[in-house]
Amino acid sequence: MKDVIIAAAVRTAVGKAPRGALRTMRPDDLAAFAINGALERVTQLDRSEIEDVILGCAMPEAEQGLNVARVASFRAGLPVECSAMTINRFCSSGLQSIAMAVDRIRGGGADVIVAGGVESMSFVPMGGNKPSLNPWLVESYPGSYLSMGLTAERVAKHYGITREQMDQFALESHRKAVAAIAAGRFEDEIVPVPVTNPAMDAKGKVKAAESLFQVDEGPRADTSLEALAKLKPVFHANGMVTAGNSSQMSDGAAAAVVMSAERAAQLGIPAMGRLIAFATAGCDPEEMGIGPVFAVPKALKMAGLALDQIGLIELNEAFAAQALAVIQVLGIDPGKVNVNGGAIALGHPLGCTGAKLTASLLREMPRRGVKYGMVTMCVGGGMGAAGILEVG
């Protein structure tokens, strides 16, 4: 079995959907920027050596359909000999793509693969443009199609999570993200993207305005506990889940260069880190958000580690309710979780998120002298995923 490294991992800044800076940027074009951004970090690597591109996408249709990974590989200028595939495990798709690349290289099926994810919720909304539910499931197992927000309400009720706890968690997400941006902690991982959007000039005329998008749009320095408390529940009249304590609709892309350690050494390419374990698990879809509770122990067992050996954790904040429940049930030290903010502030571009969090974690771990880190998230349909990273 081959030793496998992650040689580079980058992401775009995350735009707010559907009215943010990336609202007119096609997802296949956006993914190409991420792919090229990752490859620019490993200049020793000739593009002819890239054997495959694997991109995760949660809603692979319309502008992110037609095998968006293949389209993005063409837009990135990769050789036609480099194949590509799009994979979908909803919110864990970006992490899944990296895990698949690692497994493929470990087994000798390739030496160099670009893996990542892309999602434009501006172009393709949650659920897609034309949802078509299975009639049998609608009749016999309607919980399998329960909206994500209602699953969060159920998790909150089941695990005794209060509205106050959820709003406080959301506030901290914004505070940490704002501080991280001010400190420049995301600058190295972000690939600047040139965007052109309509804007009104001083005379009231609408003209095309060009800019370089390189700072996450979501974090709000002006939010407060009082402001969050005023928001009404979105999914249930008597519920607790609001727009303020849920992840944002987002646009973004991320990519990683995954290589055999042997080939990287030959080219003089250092390792950013290694994905040493990846696990998934199913759970009741009506409590989808609790998925990491079942995936994390499996990943830890695979890695031969205990939870207290994990120094940093990127736990995707689909909803404050489910993130708090996962922390509570697993007994995670909250001080290790989302130290630079999470999806409530920074956004959640579905199929991109797992690769995005990997890029962030691989940079924060060396800063804090952490050897082992974890990326984990709940997954629509009742699942959880977890990956363990090692640096040094």
Regions found by a protein language model. Give the residues of each.
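Active-site-proximal alpha-helical scaffold in enzymes
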Residues: I87-V118, A156-F186, A255-E262, I327, ...
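Conserved catalytic cysteine-centered active-site region
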Residues: M25, C57-D111, P131, P142-E153, ...
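Condensing-enzyme catalytic core mediating Claisen C-C bond formation in acyl metabolism
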Residues: M1-P27, S224-I290, F294, K301, ...
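Conserved beta-ketoacyl condensing-enzyme motif
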Residues: L22-V112, V118-P135, I190-Q214, E286-E287, ...
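Short, well-ordered amphipathic alpha-helical segments that serve as non-catalytic structural scaffolds
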Residues: P27-T43, V68-A72, S97, M148-V155, ...
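N-terminal extracellular/periplasmic Venus flytrap/periplasmic-binding protein-like
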Residues: V10-A13, T24, D28-F33, Q44, ...
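Acidic, glycine-rich active-site loops and adjacent beta-strand->loop/helix elements
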Residues: V10-A13, G56-P60, R89-S93, G117-S122, ...
